[in-house]
Amino acid sequence: MKKSVVACLMLGLFLFMIPYFSCAQDPNVIKLPPPQTDGGKPLMQALKLRQSTRGNFGPEEKLSMQTLSNLLWAADGVNRPNNFRTAPSAAGWHNIEIYVATADGLFLFDPLQHALKVISKEDVRAISGLEGQAAAPGSKMGTQDFAKTAPLSLIYVADMTKTKGMKYQGEDVGIAWSYANAGAISENVYLFCASEGLACIIRAMFDQAKVASTFKLRPEEKPILTQTIAQFKK
């Protein structure tokens, strides 16, 4: 009798621990350190410091895992029960996927697990910008070559399946509201960077087809914005 009870207890413990070991041993998932949600500059000061920077990026220097964790949580992390986020989302879609491009590879942020899913170990940072050409024909915006050496680029991809073909006043609002959702996330990143003294810029002009191909996106997944983060030039 005692042996059967012990056996049952051991079996129950084993079954309970399976999810833990599965997650811990999954080489394609990187658990981020818990975000530091205290401190930082006051909101009004961060707003005063918020700016777009392209020509003042310093030499490549990797962000620490803690800084990356804090930044991604600020972007669209879970900040209260029921998996509600730091960024608002039209119709509660939460349809913006945040791809993370660093020198170490390409990752997909999982806000519910606060983890990174490994997509590729290839350095694809360069495709988040337009290399060797102006951002728009005849524009004075300059090139986006900085993207290939900046320590971090975020690529915002809209999962259009989550919009469910929603219409408002007879018009499909999927793309427009997805841009609004991505804009809210990007502003969170801007404010975090302002608070932490990091340089940052958002861009809508990039090779979307190349991104979709490299990331192996489904037709329903639309790359819409990229945002590059770096240290300021000293």
Locate the predicted segments by residue.
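Active-site/binding-pocket entry motifs
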Residues: 160-162, 233
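Bacterial N-terminal signal peptides
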Residues: 8-19
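A glycine-rich helix N-cap at a beta->alpha junction
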Residues: 217-234
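Small-aliphatic-rich amphipathic alpha-helix that forms the alpha element of a beta-alpha
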Residues: 50, 71, 98, 152-160, ...
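Sec/Tat signal peptide C-region and signal peptidase I cleavage site
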Residues: 20-24
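N-terminal amphipathic, basic helical "cap/leader" segment at the start of enzyme domains
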Residues: 25-150
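Short, surface-exposed loop/helix-turn segments at secondary-structure junctions
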Residues: 130-134, 167-174
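Positively charged n-region of N-terminal signal peptides that target proteins for export
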Residues: 1-4
